[in-house]
Amino acid sequence: MTANAQRWKRILKVRAVQRQLAELQLHRCEKEVRNLVDLGHRISAIRAAAQPLVGAQSGMMLRSVCELSSRLDTAQRALATPSRNAQEARNRQRHAVVAARQRETA
């Protein structure tokens, strides 16, 4: 095998590993986004379940529900940034996977 052929063989192996790593990271990002979306749905369900309690209970319960609602709002705001970051990372990884595949075929 010529030196050039060996060089290209090594390059293709490295690119294949890079593509596999990019796909793995993409899978992890997608899983994180699914988890964040699931958490958002749970927060919405808790908020919906807490609303009937506001009219039925004393002022102390009202304060507790308001505190819970405030905490849920804070959690939802905290969810927005990681979700957006995960989406951006997912897009970057998709581009990296496509670029790696194009380099392999080039």
Regions found by a protein language model. Name each.
Residues M1-A106:
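Charge-rich amphipathic alpha-helical interaction elements
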